[in-house]
Amino acid sequence: MKHRGQEEMGVESTATSDEVVKVPANGNKLEGKNHKQKKLLPTNTPGDVSRVWKIEDSEALYRIEGWGQPYFSINAAGHVTVSPKGDRGGSLDLFELVNALKQRSLGLPLLIRFSDILEDRIERLNACFAKAIARYNYPGVYRGVFPVKCNQQRHLIEDLVRFGRPHQFGLEAGSKPELMIALALLDTPGSLLICNGYKDREYVETAMLSQRLGQTPIIVLEQVEEVDLVIAASHQLGIKPILGVRAKLSTQGMGRWGTSTGDRAKFGLTIPEIIQAVDKLRDADLLDSLQLMHFHIGSQISAINVIKDAIQEASRIYVELASLGANMKYLDVGGGLGVDYDGSQTNFYASKNYNMQNYANDIVAELKDTCAEKQIPVPTLISESGRAIASHQSVLIFDVLSTSDVPRDNPEPPKEGESPVINYLWETYQSINKENYQEFYHDATQFKEEAISRFNLGILRLRERAKAERLYWACCQKILDIIRQHDYVPDELEDLEKIMASIYYINLSVFQSAPDCWAIDQLFPIMPIHRLDEEPTQRGILADLTCDSDGKIDRFIDLRDVKSVLELHPFQPGEPYYMGMFLNGAYQEIMGNLHNLFGDTNAVHIQLTPKGYQIEHVVKGDTMSEVVSYVQYDSEDMVENIRQRCERALEEKRITLAESQRLLQTYEQSLRRYTYLNS
């Protein structure tokens, strides 16, 4: 269950409000899940006409105002809209946009990147730090950097450098390939290039030599061995580098990435190792090159108190380094600025109990006080906020191909001569009511198991087993209809909603497009992008195209807990049913894999214009020919193999000439097409 923070707070706004706490209108904190009971998803019964479903109901159900503000909302037509510039105006109907893109031969699944959202996120982050600096009279500046590892796509990095230029926004590289990207693209005067990750001689020399190009690379020492490497390279090249040290804080993070700190963290120097590095640099006459202190307490920090504790410890280390003679100028607070994926504004791992302004305020205030106490000049502040910048700009659109439902028809009464177990199930079904539903659920389950046992012994015929199972599902549906009207139900019936859920088969690979859903149970907001003026009467889970039982999504955002099913509309064959996965712009694309050889999806970059929008870039998804080449197949050789087999089959009269030509043509065309299904 979610462990709620002690504070509720408002969503971020362009004004970057100083308000920290926002209590619900009733004055009460949100209640967590009862240890013994859980509230099920409410639904109107088919005969319930007491109220009409409204747009506001969909807004509340999918929590779009919680996680989507100020970019996503629902319009009067029941479609999701996107406001790429936030509350500064201009919006697009996402459903209409998808249809327009499909008419341009951009098939689903489709990744839509909104360049204006990326720009708005950079503006907001810089505005928050500017406001904090002004509020606390901080005599320093903020210089953000974007960690390239969050999303290495060329068009995104190019946009980020362009949008960040007014703020001297820089880049952070965590590997040699990322360093190559950053060196080639970052041309903003005064911006910083933070060089993290494991380093060899080539990495260090390349970073140092880039100083000659007018760039400001800061080589962050993360392993003790790197100190000697940097000293040797500096002496050989005759270049005095700008150095930093990454400290392993004792402050413990929280959530999935909480182990990024501490003595056994993967990266960084312990306090004794930092002293060792300082002594070595002093002996090499390079102590004045040590100008930056860096720490990272993990990605997606959900609780503001963790940030408060970390900056308190880090600021003390910073002033001590300055007192040891280092030429300290920069403090890099790393990443961790969270994204509210579930809209609950709590310290749950998929949320955060603070906003961007709270984050900036606490960093600036603590650092100013510590430096003033020790009479040390304040540093230039740096953050590596990748997730908070990149997540919102990307929306993954996919369609539903079909559904699989448990039988919901009214069951037939038993016929004379049928197995007694069928009569027992029928009597159970007839007798279920609000008083006995729990007891009769046990009975129905027992009778179903008995029917399977009789079938395995050869006593029950196949048709009888089918009838028994239909009666069992009818009992479950009747019980579910009852408990949906209750506030809470017993633990043993909690899974009934999921047991009765439909399976919605989606045109998507979870492993390719949302690997964190599979790998670490990450929650992303998922919802239909149209029909939101209709009540979603179905409950479902999502199953992808891969031949893998893990290729599914059965965990969804909720205010009080994680839902095991998602409210969906009845699927209408022949009619499109589009769904969107939101806030997935960080890490997912680069971490996606080729399971079952489903490749990269189509991607399009959209920018708002006074008259609507323009398509800046189209990045076509992988074709079948491309994905097979990744595993060392040559498509021309494959076509030739099929051609030769067709010729042999013709010779042996196992295929007609027309059939062979049709097969060959289809085979060649398929290799040139998208790896996903035509919708």
Swiss-Prot record:
The biological processes this protein is annotated with in GO are: arginine catabolic process; spermidine biosynthetic process
Which portions of this protein are annotated as coiled-coil regions?
Answer: none
Q: Which UniProt keywords are listed?
A: Decarboxylase, Lyase, Magnesium, Metal-binding, Polyamine biosynthesis, Pyridoxal phosphate, Spermidine biosynthesis
Tell me which cofactor or cofactors this protein depends on: Mg(2+); pyridoxal 5'-phosphate
Q: Per the record, which residues fall in region Disordered?
A: 1-43
Q: What EC numbers are recorded for this enzyme?
A: 4.1.1.19
What GO MF terms are annotated?
arginine decarboxylase activity; metal ion binding
Location of N6-(pyridoxal phosphate)lysine modifications: K149
Read off the PROSITE patterns from this record: ODR_DC_2_1, ODR_DC_2_2
Reactions that this protein is recorded to catalyse: L-arginine + H(+) = agmatine + CO2
Binding residues annotated for substrate, in chain numbering: L331, D332, V333, G334, G335, G336, L337, G338, V339, D340, Y341
Top enzyme category:
lyase
Q: This protein's superkingdom?
A: Bacteria
What protein family does this chain belong to? Belongs to the Orn/Lys/Arg decarboxylase class-II family. SpeA subfamily.
The function of this protein is: Catalyzes the biosynthesis of agmatine from arginine.
Tell me what this protein is called: Biosynthetic arginine decarboxylase
Task: Give the species.
Answer: Nostoc sp. (strain PCC 7120 / SAG 25.82 / UTEX 2576)
Gene that this polypeptide is encoded by: speA
